[in-house]
């Protein structure tokens, strides 16, 4: 049993099995689709996800993806992609990464969040260029573990099986907080490098108020947590 502390950003507690979501980007495999075509394809995908969110009264998440489309259409980013580098994933991702680093260095939380948005869009664009499909199979009572999480990630997941979210990074304005609140599930952010302690299928108990996580709790701790959860219900 191991205890990890982060920042609780939603009420409630839950116990479930860890699903570690790795949204890594592969910069060694060249793109099968050139930059401009990939942008159009990704915008179409985001537009479909926006419609689905709006149809389910999840307007905040739809607004996030609207902002993602604006990033893809931002001339300060797109005009840096030259014709000879339209298939170079390193070149494309490097431009998104540089733009994000400028904003991340600023003090304002708004700009830090926008930096995370640019990185997220860059990752999704690289996957689109490579025609990479990310498949996530979430079983019932899953605790979703990730470095960061956005509506672009969760829109293709069966979030009905998720009972909690744990993030390595993020602040109170992170998009994962919006997702968690809309779904009514606890969320703990900012656990840092301690997230590496969590493996797939570990039992994880989290308290969305205190920010405390317990990895593989013993029988006594698990009984206490289940009692607390019943009182909340």
Predicted regions and their residues:
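Non-catalytic, soluble scaffold/interaction modules
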Residues: 1-233
């Amino acid at each position: 049993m191991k205890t990890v502390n982060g920042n609780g950003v939603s009420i409630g507690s839950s116990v479930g099995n860890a699903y570690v979501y790795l949204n890594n980007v592969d910069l060694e495999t060249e793109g099968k689709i050139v930059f401009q075509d990939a942008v159009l394809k990704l915008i179409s995908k985001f537009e479909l996800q926006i419609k689905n969110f709006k149809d389910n009264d999840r307007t905040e998440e739809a607004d996030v993806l609207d902002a993602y489309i604006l990033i893809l259409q931002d001339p300060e980013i797109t005009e840096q992609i030259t014709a000879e580098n339209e298939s170079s994933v390193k070149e494309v991702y490097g431009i998104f990464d540089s733009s994000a680093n400028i904003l991340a260095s600023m003090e304002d939380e708004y700009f830090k969040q926008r930096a995370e948005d640019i990185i997220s869009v860059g990752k999704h664009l690289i996957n689109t260029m490579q025609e990479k499909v990310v498949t996530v199979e979430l079983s019932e009572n899953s605790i979703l573990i990730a470095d960061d999480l956005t509506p672009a990630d969760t829109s293709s997941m069966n979030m009905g099986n998720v009972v909690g979210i744990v993030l390595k990074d993020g602040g109170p304005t992170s998009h994962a907080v919006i997702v968690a609140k809309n779904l009514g599930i606890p969320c703990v952010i900012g656990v840092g490098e301690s997230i590496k302690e969590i493996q797939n299928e570990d039992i994880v108990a989290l308290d969305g108020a205190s920010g405390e996580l317990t990895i593989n709790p013993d029988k006594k701790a698990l009984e206490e947590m289940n009692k607390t959860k019943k009182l909340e219900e």
